[in-house]
């Protein structure tokens, strides 16, 4: 996989996790965290 290190999103992504070695873990946790977050964001967006 090729990651755009110059991308601000990629840099902030590493900053939040605090390490590029967590890339694999974060990718597996992303879908799990997005599921509950998406449900919580739905009512907030409809308001």
Curated annotation (Swiss-Prot):
It comes from the Eukaryota. Residues 20-40 have a biased composition (Basic and acidic residues). Induction: By wounding. InterPro entries: Wound_ind (IPR012643). It holds the Pfam family Wound_ind. Abundant in radicals and epicotyls of seedlings and higher in the roots than in stems and leaves of mature plants. Transmembrane segments: none annotated. This is Wound-induced basic protein. It comes from Phaseolus vulgaris.
